[in-house]
């Protein structure tokens, strides 16, 4: 919990290049986590913005030519200045453009965290996936039958890229190739509103700003899962969205410790 309290105390500046579908919610989620968001995406200013930020998040949702330029510029700036960064592989399972770009970004910018659902993680690894648009395909969902196989793939991807790999879903798997965490928090409603994955990436970017990459990523995923559970009592998805942001802002460490479901593998 030290990471969480440090972010709230220091209020680090987080540069997050994301999509217009979720940008407002992402900025508010970063604020709720205790950090300060800046969502600059113009190619002529992003290097300057990234260089004064404490971490960088890039999100491949609703990709455009300008954002492709900007994310690569920011990613290289972050790498050169040892600024932690996370890439969210939105849609790489259904778009060759995004898949090719993500591979280029990973190769040239060396992000500290690679995040995606299992369809996206399989695609970036080079295995055929069954992505349903930007959502995970039914055949790619983690089950008891494919659990060990998926763990091995995630660990190999982490070791090959040098990045922490975060595969999110009904069960979340986070690995740096040596240490692996399995997280079982969360609820179905998180998948029923747009942008929760993008919001999570904003929290990951906030928490890895401390430099503690594996634990910061795991804590962000735990926090989103628990707050989803706490928010699902509301009458609908609109209320859920607001309740989710409120819970990220107000949840106590004691509740997190009580409700956390995490195991090492």
From Swiss-Prot:
UniProt cross-references to InterPro entries, sorted A to Z: Hyethyz_kinase (IPR000417), Ribokinase-like (IPR029056)
UniProtKB keywords: ATP-binding, Kinase, Magnesium, Metal-binding, Nucleotide-binding, Thiamine biosynthesis, Transferase
GO MF entry, a single one: hydroxyethylthiazole kinase activity
Cofactor(s) of this protein: Mg(2+)
CDD domains listed in its UniProt record: THZ_kinase (cd01170)
Organism from which the protein derives: Clostridium botulinum (strain 657 / Type Ba4)
Binding site for substrate: 39, 195
Gene3D superfamilies tied to this protein: 3.40.1190.20
Catalysed reactions listed for this entry: 5-(2-hydroxyethyl)-4-methylthiazole + ATP = 4-methyl-5-(2-phosphooxyethyl)-thiazole + ADP + H(+)
Function field: Catalyzes the phosphorylation of the hydroxyl group of 4-methyl-5-beta-hydroxyethylthiazole (THZ).
Pathway: Cofactor biosynthesis; thiamine diphosphate biosynthesis; 4-methyl-5-(2-phosphoethyl)-thiazole from 5-(2-hydroxyethyl)-4-methylthiazole: step 1/1
One Gene Ontology biological process: thiamine biosynthetic process
Protein name: Hydroxyethylthiazole kinase 2
Annotated residues for binding of ATP: 115, 168
Family the UniProt entry places it in: Belongs to the Thz kinase family.
Enzyme Commission (EC) number: 2.7.1.50
């Amino acid at each position: 919990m030290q990471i969480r309290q440090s972010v709230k105390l220091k209020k680090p500046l987080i540069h997050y290049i994301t999509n217009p579908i979720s940008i407002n919610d992402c900025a508010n989620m970063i604020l709720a986590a205790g950090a300060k968001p800046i969502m600059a995406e113009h190619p002529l200013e992003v290097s300057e913005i990234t260089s004064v930020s404490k971490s960088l998040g890039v999100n491949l949702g609703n990709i455009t030519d300008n954002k492709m330029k900007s994310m690569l510029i920011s990613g290289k700036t972050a790498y050169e200045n040892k600024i932690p960064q996370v890439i969210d592989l939105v849609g790489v399972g259904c778009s060759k453009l995004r898949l090719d770009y993500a591979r280029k970004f990973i190769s040239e910018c060396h992000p500290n965290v690679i995040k995606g659902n299992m369809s996206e993680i399989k695609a970036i690894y080079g295995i055929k996936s069954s992505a349903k648009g930007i959502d995970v395909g039914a055949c790619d969902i983690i089950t008891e039958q494919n659990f060990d196989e998926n763990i091995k793939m995630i660990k190999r991807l982490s070791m090959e890229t040098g990045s922490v790999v975060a595969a999110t879903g009904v069960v979340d798997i986070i690995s740096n190739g040596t240490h692996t965490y399995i997280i079982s928090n969360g609820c179905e409603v998180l998948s029923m509103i747009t942008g929760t994955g993008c919001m999570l990436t904003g929290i990951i970017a906030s928490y890895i700003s401390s430099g503690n990459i594996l634990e910061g990523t795991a804590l962000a995923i735990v926090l989103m899962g628990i707050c989803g559970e706490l928010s699902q009592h509301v009458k609908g998805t609109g209320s859920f969205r607001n309740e989710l942001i409120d819970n990220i802002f107000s949840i106590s460490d004691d509740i997190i410790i009580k409700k956390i479901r995490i195991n090492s593998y």
